[in-house]
Amino acid sequence: MYAYIRGKLTQLFPTHVVVESINGVGYEIQTPNSYRFQKYLEKELVIYTSLIVREDAQLLYGFINEEEKDMFLSLIKVTGIGPKSALAILATSTPNEVKMAIENENDAYLTKFPGIGKKTARQIVLDLKGKVQITRETTETLLSMNEENSNSENLVKEALLALEALGYSKREISKVEKVLNKSTFDSVDEAVKLGLKTLVS
C-alpha cells in the first residue's frame, strides 16, 4: 500500500522512527536499528515501507533501501519468522550477509539472532535458498551515522534500549554493556553496531 514515504524525520526511538509527511501526518515506522537514521533527524528522507495488517493493529515497517525491504518481506514468508525476528536479523546484518548465509546453508550464522532456533534457521534455508539474489553492496546499505558532541554514557544507555527492543535477553545485554562501557562513541548507531557485533561473534 505504501511503497515509500518521503518526509522529515522528527523523532527517533529504540524500536521505531516518526516521519512527518508533506501534508503534516506523522507516520510511526518500525525499523531494524532505528539509529541508522540518526543523521537524518530533522531532515528530509525517503524511507521504503511495508504495511502489515493484523487483527489488532496496522503496522508500518521501514527500511533504508528496497533491497533491505525485499529481504524483510522474504523472511516473514518463512514459517516461524515474524516481523520482529526479521527486523532483528536485519538490524545486525546486511541483506547480502543474510543471503550468503542462506545460500551457504549456514544455519549456525542464522541461529545467532534472537528468536531463531535451529529448526527455524533450517526452515529459512529450505524456503529461501535459490530464491534470493546476492547483489553489489550500496553505500545506503552500509549507512554510517556520525553525530558529534554526544555524551558516550547516554549513547550506551540508548544503545542498550535498542538491543532490548530487538529481543536480546538481559544476560546478553549485560555482557554487551561491559564491552560498550570500555569504548567511546560519536553516535548511538556506532554503539548499537558494536553491541550487535559482540552478540553475534
Swiss-Prot record:
Residues 144-150 are annotated as: Flexible linker. Residues 151-201 are annotated as: Domain III. It holds the Pfam family RuvA_N. Transmembrane segments: none annotated. Residues 1-64 are annotated as: Domain I. Keywords: Cytoplasm, DNA damage, DNA recombination, DNA repair, DNA-binding. Residues 65-143 are annotated as: Domain II. GO terms for molecular function: ATP binding; four-way junction DNA binding; four-way junction helicase activity. GO terms for cellular component: cytoplasm; Holliday junction helicase complex; Holliday junction resolvase complex. Its main location: cytoplasm. It comes from the Bacteria. It is found in: Cytoplasm. SUPFAM superfamilies: DNA helicase RuvA subunit, C-terminal domain (SSF46929), Nucleic acid-binding proteins (SSF50249), RuvA domain 2-like (SSF47781). One of its GO terms (biological process) is DNA recombination. SMART domains: HhH1. HAMAP family: DNA_HJ_migration_RuvA. Has three domains with a flexible linker between the domains II and III and assumes an 'L' shape. Domain III is highly mobile and contacts RuvB. Belongs to the RuvA family. Homotetramer. Forms an RuvA(8)-RuvB(12)-Holliday junction (HJ) complex. HJ DNA is sandwiched between 2 RuvA tetramers; dsDNA enters through RuvA and exits via RuvB. An RuvB hexamer assembles on each DNA strand where it exits the tetramer. Each RuvB hexamer is contacted by two RuvA subunits (via domain III) on 2 adjacent RuvB subunits; this complex drives branch migration. In the full resolvosome a probable DNA-RuvA(4)-RuvB(12)-RuvC(2) complex forms which resolves the HJ. The RuvA-RuvB-RuvC complex processes Holliday junction (HJ) DNA during genetic recombination and DNA repair, while the RuvA-RuvB complex plays an important role in the rescue of blocked DNA replication forks via replication fork reversal (RFR). RuvA specifically binds to HJ cruciform DNA, conferring on it an open structure. The RuvB hexamer acts as an ATP-dependent pump, pulling dsDNA into and through the RuvAB complex. HJ branch migration allows RuvC to scan DNA until it finds its consensus sequence, where it cleaves and resolves the cruciform DNA. This is Holliday junction branch migration complex subunit RuvA.
